[in-house]
Amino acid sequence: MLKLNNNINLNKNNKISEIVQNGGYNKISERLDFIKFLLDDTDLKPMINYIDKDKYFYKDKNILNLLEKKSKSFKSTIKKIGGKLLYVKSGTTGHTFKGISYPDENNLDLCINYGVKVVAYPKKENYGDIKDSSRPENAELLMLKILSSFVVNNQTPHIVLPISTFNTSINIFVSLTKNNIITNKKYDQFVEKCENNEFHDTVSVLISEWADGGDLLDFLRENYNKLSIREWRVIFFQILSVLAVIQTKHPGFRHNDLKANNILLQKINNVDKNNIYKYNINNNEYYVPNIGLRIKLWYFDFACIPGEIDNSKVFADWTDRINVKPEAHPYYDVHYFFSTLTSKNFIPNYKKIPEEVQQFIERVVPKCVKNGTNSTERGRLLLDYNEILKMPEIIYKSPEDIIKYDSFFDKMRPK
C-alpha cells in the first residue's frame, strides 16, 4: 500500500458523500459530478468536456497541447485528490493502482475509489517522441477523451470515464519494490527494464473511474455455468450496443483488442430486478433488464479511428499480419470478442453455457470465420471487411445488425 495524505476539503467530502449515500454512481449525472468533485482543490484539468460536448481536440501531434498535460509530482498530486493507493496488477508496461479514500472520517463504511494507471514509454519501440500523439500510450488517452462524449451526451453508459492525466518521473515507481511496497513478478520485470534504461524517464499517469466488479473474464470464469439466458443476453447487448453507438459516429473505430479481460464491470447498487433501462440506438428502442452489472469498455492502447486518432501500433508490420490495420472494419471487434470468449483459455467448459446462448454465438461467428485460413489460432480474423460483405454465411456484418435483427434480442425490442 502506497500511503498518502487522506485530508481533502470538507466541502468536497460532503459532496462526494452525498453521491455515495444516494446509491453510488449508477446515473451518468452522478458519474460526471463525482469527477468534478474529485478534482476540486487540485490543479488537474478534466479530460472530459462538460460545456462543448462534441468538441474533442484540434489536429495537433503534441499530446501535451491536446490534453493540456503537465508534468507533476506524483505524491503531491495524489495527496490533493485524496486517499491512499493500493497496487492491483501490472501489464507489459502499464500498472494499475486503486485509489481509496474515506470522505467522512466518522463513517469508515463510506469509501470512494478511483483508478490510477501508470504507463511507461519504451525506448526500443519505433513510436517516436513521448509527446507524439500517435504513440499507443497517448492514443489511448485521446481515445478515452473522444469516447467519453458518448457518456456525457447520455448515448451510452458503457465506457470508463477518464478523469485527468499528467506526466511524472519514473523514479518513484522503481523504488516501490525496494521498499517492499509491491511484490509482483511483472512489476519486478518492469523495474529491471527501468534499471536497464529501456524506458524514458517520464511516465504517463491516468486517473479514471474505478470499476468495482473486476473484469468480465474473471467474472465469466467464475459464473459461466450459473448465468441465466437473461443475464447472458444483457451482457452481450451492453457490449454490442456501445460498439453500435460508437461506430455510428465514427465508422472507422476499432478497439482491436476487444476480449473479455479488456472489459470491466461496474456493480449497480440498490438493484431492483424490475428496473428496465431504455436504450435508443440509432432511433431504435430497446428495453434492457437490470442484472446488477454494467460493462464498461477499457484498454484502448490498440484502438484507432483512422483520420481522427492515429495509433502507431496499428501501422506496425506485426499487426498487419493479424489484420489490425487503419481501415474501417465493423465486424472485427465483434468477431474477436466472441472467438476468444469461446476458447478454452477463456471459458473452461464452453458447452456448459445455455444452448440458446451457444446458438447465438454461432450465428454471429459461424465456423467459416472461426477456423482454418480465415482466422488465427488466437481468434484474429484475417479477412478484410470487403471480403466479409461478400460472405452470405455471415448474417450480421456489424454490432448494430446483431441487436437490431437477431432473435436473441427479440425480448428487448418493443412489441
For each of these PLM feature ranges, what is it?
Residues V20, G24-I48, K313, R321-K415:
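Helical subdomain adjoining the active site within ATP-dependent kinase catalytic cores
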Residues P157-I229:
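Conserved structural core of kinase catalytic domains
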Residues L147-S148, N223-H255, A260, N270:
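Conserved kinase catalytic-core helix
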Residues G99-V160, T165-N171:
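ATP-binding glycine-rich loop module of kinase domains
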Residues D52-C111:
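ATP-binding glycine-rich phosphate-binding loop
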Residues S101-D104, V119-K123, N167-S169, A211-D215, ...:
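Conserved beta-strand elements of beta-rich interaction domains across eukaryotes
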Residues G252-A328:
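Catalytic activation segment of kinase domains across protein kinase-like and atypical kinase folds
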Residues T92-F97, L110-Y114, T156-L161, T202-L206, ...:
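Core residues of folded domains in eukaryotic genome-function proteins
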